[in-house]
């Protein structure tokens, strides 16, 4: 029984090691976001993709993308833990035409999509919430809030 336990732990541990390299993992668009060049309505979308490496067994990385009416780009908001280790804020904000990129090899799923006047009304509330996010400069995987 002891040998079986050691074998199972070894297999589990080795399978947790990935041959994927975050530097070469796909970050291309999944093709599920509306093109801001042709979609003029306001848009709010929330995406989730498996976290990188073994973390993907237990967690997803989520991010919010907002595009005000007639905007040429989306603003993406996400919390990224590795940024804190480099002296940067965990909260990341950037502009893009493709908010639906793979999360280091993991294809995102769109878990919320809202367009039109309702989205336009909520975007300022999201921007305000982001600007007041209390954990913008810190990150803890467990127990959260990130």
PLM feature spans:
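Generic ordered-secondary-structure signal
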Residues: 36, 76, 86, 133-141
